[in-house]
């Protein structure tokens, strides 16, 4: 593992390091991961039918306002940085999207990685065709990079009330 010391003497400073390390046969406990709570723009609102999920900024993305239309989820590393360039072959990332539904249920109807359509492997073997009304739908995804621009994407939808 390589860490770098940063000293700031004046002004404001935001530092968001990426530390890559290998842990083989080890035990990690009490990990804390970042969750983004979006209280203003739900999927489908104001024509927002494509959601860019930047995995470098959160492991969980929660929309607390009601979903108003089906949406496409685009998975990428960051604005201007592809997932393909961030992951090596054999690496994976797991992330979650939580949406709030009112009486009319909507769902994640399409998925892309770096803007390219991908067909996931769905838990239970059948693609979801609807969301769940008056509840939270939790979508869990694992993307495994198997070659350049090639992934296995595992996807699950779970209802919480």
Model feature map: region roles:
Residues 48, 66-161:
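Acidic, glycine/polar-enriched metal-coordinating patches/loops
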Residues 57-64:
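Short carbohydrate-recognition loop motifs
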Residues 53-57, 87-90:
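Flexible, charged surface loops at secondary-structure boundaries
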Residues 1-56, 148-161:
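Glycine-rich, low-complexity segments
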């Amino acid at each position: 593992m390589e860490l770098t010391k940063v000293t700031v003497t004046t002004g404001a400073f935001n530092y968001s390091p990426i530390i890559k390390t290998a842990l083989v046969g080890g035990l990690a406990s009490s990990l804390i991961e970042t969750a983004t709570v979006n209280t203003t723009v739900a999927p489908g609102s104001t024509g927002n039918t494509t959601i860019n999920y930047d995995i470098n900024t959160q492991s969980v993305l929660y929309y607390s306002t009601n979903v108003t239309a089906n949406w496409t989820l685009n998975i990428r590393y960051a604005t201007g940085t592809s997932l393909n360039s961030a992951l090596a072959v054999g690496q994976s990332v797991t992330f979650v999207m939580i949406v709030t539904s009112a009486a009319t249920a909507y769902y994640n109807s399409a998925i892309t990685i770096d803007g390219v359509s991908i067909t996931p492997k769905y838990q239970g073997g059948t693609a979801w065709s609807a969301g769940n009304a008056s509840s939270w739908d939790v979508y869990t995804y694992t993307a495994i990079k198997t070659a350049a621009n090639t992934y296995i994407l595992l996807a699950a939808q779970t209802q919480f009330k």
